[in-house]
UniProtKB/Swiss-Prot annotation:
Organism: Schistosoma japonicum
Chain residues that bind substrate: 111
Annotated InterPro entries: Glutathione-S-Trfase_C-like, Glutathione-S-Trfase_C_sf, Glutathione_S-Trfase, Glutathione_S-Trfase_N, GST_C, GST_superfamily, Thioredoxin-like_sf
Further remarks about this protein from its record: There are at least two isoenzymes of GST in S.japonicum.
The protein's name: Glutathione S-transferase class-mu 26 kDa isozyme
Length: 218
C-alpha cells in the first residue's frame, strides 16, 4: 500500500514534501481536504492512529507522522538524503532553518489585516536573507553541492511564494534565478508542475490576506 499524505488542498507547509516525493518518484496517495471540509477533517483526525493529530499527516505502514518537518525529514532519511557525516547533517539542518526564516516570515504576516503595512518591513529585510542563499550557490549546483537535498525544495517553494509578493525580488540574485529554473528543469519536477496533481494556488490557507482565496492575483 502506498504512503498517504494528508493536507488541505493548498500549497502551504506541505508543498516541499510533495516536490520531494515527486523527485524521488515515490508512489503516494494524497488525501486532500477542500476549503469547506473542516468538519470532515475534524471527524476523521482521531481515527487515523496519529499520536499528535494535525495536518499535514503522513502514513507509511506503521509509521504515522504529523508536523511538516518531521515528515519531510523522514522521507529524506528513507532515501539516505540527510547527509553522510555529522557536519553534512548539521549543514542540512541549518539550511532548513534558514529557509524557514523566509517561509515562516511570510506566514506570520500573510493572515493579518495589516498585511500591506507589514509587507513593507518584510521586503526590506528579504534581500539580506536572499543574499545568503545567493552566496551559498556561488560555487554549488544545489544548496548542499552537486546533489539535491530536501532544503532545495523548501527554498524553491519559498522563492515561489515571495515572487508573488514582489515579482522583482530576485532581480539582484542571478544565482537564485538560475537555481529556481534548475529545479523546474528536473524531469520529475517538470512533469509534476505540468500535471493535474500540481496545486498552484492558494499559497496559504484560503482565508489569508496574502496567498489566500481561490485564485492568484492577476
Amino acid at each position: 500500500m502506498s504512503p498517504i499524505l494528508g493536507y488541505w488542498k493548498i500549497k502551504g507547509l506541505v508543498q516541499p514534501t510533495r516536490l520531494l516525493l515527486e523527485y524521488l518518484e515515490e508512489k503516494y496517495e494524497e488525501h486532500l481536504y477542500e476549503r469547506d471540509e473542516g468538519d470532515k477533517w475534524r471527524n476523521k483526525k482521531f481515527e487515523l492512529g496519529l499520536e499528535f493529530p494535525n495536518l499535514p499527516y503522513y502514513i507509511d505502514g506503521d509509521v504515522k507522522l504529523t508536523q511538516s518537518m518531521a515528515i519531510i525529514r523522514y522521507i529524506a532519511d528513507k532515501h539516505n538524503m540527510l547527509g553522510g557525516c555529522p557536519k553534512e547533517r548539521a549543514e542540512i539542518s541549518m539550511l532548513e532553518g534558514a529557509v524557514l526564516d523566509i517561509r515562516y516570515g511570510v506566514s506570520r504576516i500573510a493572515y493579518s489585516k495589516d498585511f500591506e503595512t507589514l509587507k513593507v518591513d518584510f521586503l526590506s529585510k528579504l534581500p539580506e536573507m536572499l543574499k545568503m542563499f545567493e552566496d551559498r550557490l556561488c560555487h554549488k549546483t544545489y544548496l548542499n553541492g552537486d546533489h539535491v537535498t530536501h532544503p532545495d525544495f523548501m527554498l524553491y517553494d519559498a522563492l515561489d511564494v515571495v515572487l508573488y509578493m514582489d515579482p522583482m525580488c530576485l532581480d539582484a540574485f542571478p544565482k537564485l534565478v538560475c537555481f529556481k529554473k534548475r529545479i523546474e528543469a528536473i524531469p520529475q519536477i517538470d512533469k509534476y508542475l505540468k500535471s493535474s496533481k500540481y496545486i498552484a494556488w492558494p499559497l496559504q490557507g484560503w482565508q489569508a490576506t496574502f496567498g489566500g482565496g481561490d485564485h492568484p492575483p492577476k
